[in-house]
Amino acid sequence: MSQQGESSDPKSGKKDFSTAILERKKSPNRLVVDEAVNDDNSVVTMHPQTMEKLQLFRGDTILIKGKKRKDTICIALADENCEEPKIRMNKVVRSNLRVRLGDVVSVHQCPDVKYGKRVHILPIDDTIEGVTGNLFDAFLKPYFLEAYRPVRKGDLFLVRGGMRSVEFKVVETDPGEYCVVAPDTEIFCEGEPLKREDEERLDEVGYDDVGGVRKQMAQIRELVELPLRHPQLFKSIGVKPPKGILLYGPPGSGKTLIARAVANETGAFFFCINGPEIMSKLAGESESNLRKAFEEAEKNAPSIIFIDEIDSIAPKREKTHGEVERRIVSQLLTLMDGLKSRAHVIVIGATNRPNSIDPALRRFGRFDREIDIGVPDEVGRLEVLRIHTKNMKLSDDVDLERIAKDTHGYVGADLAALCTEAALQCIREKMDVIDLEDETIDAEVLNSMAVTNEHFQTALGTSNPSALRETVVEVPNVSWEDIGGLENVKRELQETVQYPVEHPEKFEKFGMSPSKGVLFYGPPGCGKTLLAKAIANECQANFISVKGPELLTMWFGESEANVREIFDKARQSAPCVLFFDELDSIATQRGSSVGDAGGAADRVLNQLLTEMDGMSAKKTVFIIGATNRPDIIDPALLRPGRLDQLIYIPLPDEDSRHQIFKACLRKSPIAKNVDLRALARHTQGFSGADITEICQRACKYAIRENIEKDIERERKSRENPEAMDEDTVDDEVAEIKAAHFEESMKFARRSVSDADIRKYQAFAQTLQQSRGFGSEFRFPESGDRTTTGSDPFAASAGGADEDDLYS
């Protein structure tokens, strides 16, 4: 069971202690839950040796402790067939303990269980629909007669009788928490049937329900459980236990859930303060609310105070203008670490803006530990998906690992939304057999429902990570087939963007980080933006499109902040492709922009430079820029490490033009006599956009002709209805004919002049020259000792016979 911790880091001989608290302790009274053979609600069976180890005898009453601080009491019997560290119990006992098969429970002796004087037992309302007759005679009497069953207050148990099985709940027992129902015990079953409380109620979140934060969970448990359960540990070493934890991370990553789980599993008193609620209009009222909360918690120690959205009540004091906020911050500071020490009270704060909290709160003694609950990685996402789908009916073809791979940048909440969406998709398919008017739905319809892989794929298409909600880009459905020509450009792009996402281990093996930037340049209308769309669609990364000019705002310092935010978002939902269209609007050469908004463009460019290759670590964020004025872009952007791959996208040649015609007309019906090759030959110097325009225009003519024919036919049929019947036969197929293309070619025009093309080619050539510097370089042969001739500058240094200054 504790294998995970030891093998967590095989390379170093040292054991990783950071998650030590999560490991199961070995002790003889911890047993693994197994399915029962005989179905009795009050009996659990163990191997005789296990019984001997625990000093139990056949028929002893034992107390079993399960998850979420639930326990129940049962009678222990020996069973030779049960394996050693296992305990067999049926479904009723398991649900009372909130455990599943394979979980671990602890068994304790429970010697002095009294015979009960009276017990109060009520049925659960949804199991007794249509049951007639006296419940007591039919169900309870045969169940308890001569059986001496132990019961625990709050337990549910299932009784089979006649044709039905009914669930009952033990509402009250006298004496105390548990007792044995003997023949002289009075059983009350008067009263309204109980409503079933949801077994998985929200306030019953356990550690099992939090996935993807294993390391953080371990840290939180050391900080919370150790001081609350064993304060003497810290006393014996002589340090004060930590008292505050600040959880921060993007919204939806499970901060509040973790706090709930901790409170439930430790059994501490849980006091929740929602930031904005303690504000009040009366002076001094808000502070006293805070004081009351802390006093309440100290009365009920050990306790946990959870302050959600702490940035709303403890902002930086310099920045706030209101007097009230400052007083509240001061009050919080003194409460958390004032002269009066607080014992056994742990404060957990949660926020997604840790930098807007007053810095005095973030020192040791107040919030000692700051735990970053980030976006989960692939393993974490798989855990979260398993948790959300554990109660769903999944068909066999659902591949959760695959889904976890495809959901880059999703946090827990997004994965929950994904599962819900998949289930809804499943329900929508069955809507034709579900009638909303009916009272009940057929059982076979309900049983036939299962969520398939297809439903998940549909849901994946409609959902996106919440970090990207405001910069959301509908991932365009452009694939590589839509792009005619440009074969080698496509290949380079795939290598730049798809390899690092799909084969990260290769890069690690060769010890290099992949290049992160590409700049497309070339005449307008050649498919630069289209390429970026295709790569966003083909590679499973998230895609943020940034239009250059919209980053600039009128406020000072705001434009740079926009750049920073975009990069932050991209990092949160990595791997991510950032596409800057019209890059020249924000990346002009510095110093050239005189007088525009106090040089805002220059500052934006500086921010861009530092974000792309500054001190902060880049995760897998790819930057693709597109521009048709490469000559005015600041050279600092074009150095390797920022936009290191400069790809010139030229006007298409004849083959590419043929491909573009094909790609444009993929879905259109074309007459047999249209020769696309001839069209491609005649459109020398046209860009991709011009070619698309030719196709659109030809389409327009075809549609016009078609509509005119329809009108003509209707008129004829009105004039003489008899002739209509023969006429419908020779209705020709609607298609784009050669005549339409000829008509369309009359209006065709080139959007890029020759002078422009020459400019682009000159720029491309200068880049080629600066690039091809070491084309003569060869490694010297191993036998060849003389390497003097390999220096290209030595020959041009004007003969070596002159005295060289530097020799």
UniProtKB/Swiss-Prot annotation:
InterPro entries: AAA+_ATPase, AAA_ATPase_CDC48, AAA_ATPase_domain, AAA_lid_3, Asp_de-COase-like_dom_sf, ATPase_AAA_core, ATPase_AAA_CS, Cdc48_dom2
Organism: Glycine max
GO biological process terms, semicolon-separated: autophagosome maturation; mitotic spindle disassembly; proteasome-mediated ubiquitin-dependent protein catabolic process; retrograde protein transport, ER to cytosol
Region described as Disordered: 1-21, 771-807
Entry-linked NCBIfam families: CDC48 (TIGR01243)
Keyword Nucleotide-binding in record: yes
Basic and acidic residues composition bias: residue spans: 8-21
CDD domains in the record: RecA-like_CDC48_r1-like (cd19519), RecA-like_CDC48_r2-like (cd19528)
Membrane topology category: Peripheral membrane protein
Family stated for the protein in its record: Belongs to the AAA ATPase family.
Tree of life domain: Eukaryota
Protein name: Cell division cycle protein 48 homolog
Gene Ontology MF term list: ATP binding; ATP hydrolysis activity; polyubiquitin modification-dependent protein binding
